[in-house]
């Protein structure tokens, strides 16, 4: 008989056995339920982590697309790494006004609000990544720029976009999806 790992299938199989049966805490069926529950929790946590990573990547690319499609840069076909560095800095500093406002609003003897802590942690993490190499679309390639300008904002087409890593000095660092 095949081993069932899915929690829903396991629960369904147990309910088929008979009327409302109780499972002994040290029994074989209970251990199966515990393993299946732990497995479901682990899979859900990995899915959430992966989804969060994709959302952050999508936000970066969308920000770059908005900058590139703005009226100021509409006619420029490609950008060098120095321009890309400036765009990344503006992306990292996008919440600085709200962060400063939250710091001013907070009284001196009170702990920071959850929103302030969240914004500060995100900013610190992005700055740390920027020093090592910030993952962003390659704006120095004409084909990539054309694709970025016409990108519809979906996850599926994001894989065809060439990404590179730019550090805080404006140099390309080894990495990305090249």
Curated annotation (Swiss-Prot):
<dbReference type="GO" id="GO:0005634">
    <property type="term" value="C:nucleus"/>
</dbReference>
<dbReference type="InterPro" id="IPR038356">
    <property type="entry name" value="Tma16_sf"/>
</dbReference>
<protein>
    <recommendedName>
        <fullName>Translation machinery-associated protein 16</fullName>
    </recommendedName>
</protein>
<dbReference type="InterPro" id="IPR021346">
    <property type="entry name" value="Tma16"/>
</dbReference>
<keyword id="KW-0539">Nucleus</keyword>
<comment type="similarity">
    <text>Belongs to the TMA16 family.</text>
</comment>
<dbReference type="Pfam" id="PF11176">
    <property type="entry name" value="Tma16"/>
</dbReference>
